[in-house]
Amino acid sequence: MGKNRKSKRQLVRDEKRAKKRGLEIEHEEERDIKKQRREEEAHQDAFAPVTDAGYVPPPLDGTYDENAFPGGPEEGRRNGPNTNFEREFFGMLAEQEQEYFRHADELLELNDFPSTEERDIFLQNVYKELRGKELKVASSQSCSRLMERLILLSNTRQKKSLFDAFGGHFISLVTHRFASHCCEKLFLQSAPVVTQELSGEYEQEPLPEGEEETEAMKSSMEDLFLLTLDELEEHLGYLLTDRFGSHAIRALLVILSGRPLDQAGTKSMLQSRKKEYITVEGAAANQSELSSQIRAVPSSFTMAIKKIIDDSTMTMDATALRVLAKHPTGNPTLQLLLELELTMFVKGKEKKEKNKQKKDDEEAEEKKEETQSEVTLLGMLVPDAPAAFADNTTQAAEFVNSMIYDPIGSRLLETLITHCPGKIFKGLQQHIFGPRIQSLLRNDIACYPAIKVLNRLSREDLADAVEKSLPEMASFVDKGRFNVIRTLFERCHIRNGTDEINALLKALTSAYGNDWKKLVPKLCMLDEDVVEEEQKPDPKFQTQEAKNKAFMLNHGCQLVAALLAIPGQPSKAIQASLAALKPAQVMKMATTSHNTSSILVKALQTPATNPTFHKVLVSSLLPHVYELATSQQGSAVLNEIISLPSKPAEPNAPAVPFHMKENIISQLANYESELRETWLGRNVWRTWKGDMWSHRRHDWVRWAKETDPETARVAAIPRKREEKEKEEAEKKPKGYLGKNFDPKKLKGFAAKKFEKKEAEA
């Protein structure tokens, strides 16, 4: 047989295709560079013209160009327009270099190396090839992902070498579309090293043969971060509103503050929802534990944060701050600056002042004058607070009122309400939020700052807010403000407001026809057609109506879960509603979405107000065991059942009868081959120990009863009658003569002995 060889025509065609593909990649990079330059030029042209006369006032209609320099036209006059630096172009990689780095990226993405030593050797070879081309690779569309993966797998010495390569070019890199992601990754991955060096736990890696040690490798990571900040310092005003640079500034602020890097709130602050998640298989195991906890940072980092806040706000006036507060890019950075100032400096000063004893009245007055003379970001946003909140014409009151209903500015207001000192919060509550709390809770934007206010209210103020909100309960339900209702219930439970909880439950039930059974079907939308999570389209292609329905379902399920966690009437109402559901509705809850299935899991974990509650809930699921086992949401409900005991340890404690567990495992055994074909089915089969059931059933029974109380695990062993009587006699108190003892029936010696004992007693 002849060998399958390509013809000459096919080889020529493949060569043409490869050249065409290479040209397309080059053209794509050129187009991206030209597009970025056009955007920069357009951004520069957006600046308001500034004359030598000084400040250019905003238009009379109250509008302001959000693309203007965040420091206002005065800063533009002093520092020049936003382009007070020249964006560098680092050149393009050759075709062979691109091919090499692309292949290295594929190998690193799989991370399928025989051992860590071979991977380290491969990384060293890549770094040798990368030497002198770091800036080109970081700013390349096709190879910047390689740089991010290299940073994930690099040791401390290699990270310091990248700081050395990027040094002097950070302002161009952090504002670049692709290189900015590499800088963020380098900052975040290097943050734990600062704490390790500070505590003395860091050990220097050995220098590879043939490599010279640079000055950056000898320097500490703290010094490298401070040098980076020095380089970015003069451009902070521009970076606050830059599309890419603002993310790098936020990352640096989080690192300097020592906050955890892996928390969900931190990640949402640092990156947008559209950001591509670059990772390496198995790289998560190499990450330091310091990323998920509060880190110790040197004092120089705290001073750097203070300097960044001062430099960022020094050249701004009230108008520029309002523009920045409503700027979609500048607002998150301003939130972080305000939060750091309030948590690290304002509250720290208050604690110190309380702990220190004032020696003289004169010294106390001098301290007050000094603190009043200091210009802070909080003081610029709400000057003369809290006294200024009493007058609606003051700058502080106007700022708060203008931000309440703004979709972007309200987020800054949430940060202010959450972290501001108690005196300022009392002024906000007394003059702005308290009198109209019920109308603010009705609004789809203002309800979020109002919820933050509810979280800080005292017992008396919360009772007043609940009293004002009770007549609006029907409106809350119609508009889908379930997050507002949930917050009211949770805060009343924390503040031990039993009367308020009962009043809220009564108002909520009346909005649904005074019937507890309607709560879960209405709040979880069981009567409406809801698309399952597996069949949902991409969020980009969802209609606004579908998105609103998803949000309402999410908030409704959160409300049900909150009511279920509150003992007393709220938990009783939700359990009664769950017990009244039809089997089809329970099955829909278990398989439709994670929000609804989590309610069933929590219901199985909650103590029952009705002894048959858990039994009724599980019996509704018994006919659909296979469907639950192969469902992503239903499998979690099924796995929760086996973790519950068969007999309750205490009255009304969660329990599922053992015969129901046997019924479920026998049904799973009938579908064993089908379950083994899917990952979810294998997970359920493993959790229920199906192999043990098939081969060693008596061991499975013993294992299934391990969750039962100690005395209820096995049946009692038959014993002799004499042993039983002996045990019963030992349990009886001394001198016990039985229930039916009658001393009048005693005769002779027994009667005399009883009389003697009675006389002695």
From Swiss-Prot:
GO biological process: endonucleolytic cleavage in 5'-ETS of tricistronic rRNA transcript (SSU-rRNA, 5.8S rRNA, LSU-rRNA); endonucleolytic cleavage in ITS1 to separate SSU-rRNA from 5.8S rRNA and LSU-rRNA from tricistronic rRNA transcript (SSU-rRNA, 5.8S rRNA, LSU-rRNA); endonucleolytic cleavage to generate mature 5'-end of SSU-rRNA from (SSU-rRNA, 5.8S rRNA, LSU-rRNA); ribosomal small subunit export from nucleus
Gene3D superfamilies named among the record's database cross-references: Leucine-rich Repeat Variant
Organism the protein comes from: Sordaria macrospora (strain ATCC MYA-333 / DSM 997 / K(L3346) / K-hell)
Positions annotated as Pumilio repeat: 129-164, 165-200, 231-271, 395-430, 432-467, 620-666
Lineage: Eukaryota, Fungi, Dikarya, Ascomycota, Pezizomycotina
One term under GO cellular component: nucleolus
Sequence ranges of Basic residues compositional bias: 1-10
Protein name: Nucleolar protein 9
Region ranges (Disordered): 1-56, 350-372, 712-739
Primary location group: nucleus
SUPFAM superfamilies linked to this entry: ARM repeat (SSF48371)
